[in-house]
A protein has these predicted regions:
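Conserved phosphate- and dinucleotide-binding cores of soluble alpha/beta proteins
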Residues: 67-170
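N-terminal active-site beta-alpha-beta segment that forms phosphate/nucleotide-binding
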Residues: 1-95, 99
């Protein structure tokens, strides 16, 4: 899909579906956590900027070398991070800042209808979300919604799934 007109169409539909999900969870105008997509991930390059318009503050992840995510506010000067992902500069927060969010929007490689999310296998998001009572929506393309994904006891289920076709709660 990379670089194609079809990907642009799907990614624009993901923005629309994500904003609808934000509204459904009552998170518009509250703090939201999201991500800057890699070219292989769902969402356009300006995904964070588009979501920031709906948030009081948009927090973006920063990958630390020890497999932990830190968070910084969108709008701080961006720089290439450790994993090649564009990350904001500025004050860093622990994942406890997610407690202030009305919604966490997370990328995934796949998600099943029970809400189990398949990430890239490093467990960054599972560690960040462990023990937090915050709604999480996984963003995938429609064909990445599957019957079942492999998961372990530490894997965190999501509360909603966002695709170009819309979103659904688990």
């Amino acid at each position: 899909l990379r670089g194609t007109e079809r990907k642009r169409e799907l990614d624009q539909a993901i923005v629309t579906a994500t904003l609808a999900c934000v509204d459904d969870f009552g998170a518009r105008g509250s703090n939201i956590a999201a991500y800057n997509p890699l070219s292989s991930e769902p969402g356009p390059a300006d995904f964070a900027a588009l979501l920031a318009a709906a948030a009081r503050t948009l927090f973006l992840p920063i990958s630390l070398p020890d497999g932990v995510l830190a968070w910084a506010q969108h709008g701080a000067k961006d720089a290439a991070g450790a994993l090649g992902i564009t990350e904001p500069n500025g004050p860093r927060f622990t994942s406890n800042v997610l407690r202030s969010c009305g919604l966490v929007v997370a990328p995934a490689l796949a998600v099943d209808r029970q809400g189990m999310r398949l990430g890239k296998g490093a467990g960054y998001y599972d560690r960040a979300l462990a023990g937090l009572d915050v709604p999480v929506a996984a963003v995938v393309y429609d064909w990445e919604v599957v019957d079942a994904v492999p998961h372990d006891a530490h894997d965190q289920a999501v509360d909603a799934v966002i695709t170009p076709e819309g979103f659904f709660r688990i």
